């Protein structure tokens, strides 16, 4: 009488199928999980997730739907159930309020997805610094504030550049984290494992 659970995410685009599967996996590490998706990108991403977690993954296609059945391997310790939050040694330097180059509109949508994925990720950065226009993401009316607050609640250090907040006239609107300066940020860039976005 193995515990079997179904995650039906047909009609959803990435990263939602992986996020929903991960939630069920975290809560039920011993269960056999069948995720149903209706596109190949989601199928591939859920399969990668299952294999990264040590599941045996079987895929069955029915029309345009894909059924991915993930069976836990008994010899693997179920991960995520009792372990403390894991922090990487990375510091993220956010330099603007959209991701990538080419299209700002696309970049703003990507940024929303980025913060959702960051909240769901197993390994968190130790700190996130915000400079230039990225400081707009940590003010009270930001669409990203809720997810960035979740990261702060999970122990990620959030710090925004004071000069930048002043420049955009939003210092009084800071909604999460602390105010820092370029000296501290430069110190971190020179001494820590920095990822610039």
How would you label these PLM feature ranges?
Residues 1-46:
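Ordered, small/hydrophobic-rich secondary-structure cores
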Residues 34-37, 125-132, 157-162:
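Short internal beta-strands
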Residues 74-80:
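Short, charged/polar, Gly/Pro-enriched secondary-structure boundary elements
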Residues 179-182, 188-196:
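C-terminal binding/interaction regions
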